[in-house]
Amino acid sequence: PPGRALYGDEIELTGWIRGLGKARLQIAHGSDWRVLAHLRARSDGRFSVRVPALASTRYRLAYNGFAGPEVGLSVVPRVDVQADGTTLKVRVTPSLPARVDRLTAKQWRPVAAGTGTFERELGPGSYRVAVGGDSRYASAVSRPVGLR
């Protein structure tokens, strides 16, 4: 099962469908299922499909009205943080609201916020950027960076 992936990465869904002929890979769309691909197995019965990780979702195999178990994928937003002197440069992909935390007395405390790509002038210290999760994306926290 794919499990977890960074936004924009390609993941490989693999499985075994020997004897099913032409099965369908389906993707959840709200409460419905849509065909993502018609699968043809190799001679050993295995298949492989590459799909972009653009939002958390579920996949399943279907054949002649029967569906297999669901496999979930949690997509984590990319959070890139750079320190440039007293400026914290942040890029969250896809563009999502983010919180800038500063390490104070051994605790992370919020000091700023932004959405997508933004910069903040901040005092010296250790900072990180956190993105809250929702139904489409898992939560993410950047590595700490230091400003001088």
Residue ranges and their predicted role:
Residues 1-148:
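Low-complexity, Ser/Thr/Pro-rich intrinsically disordered linker/stalk segments at domain junctions
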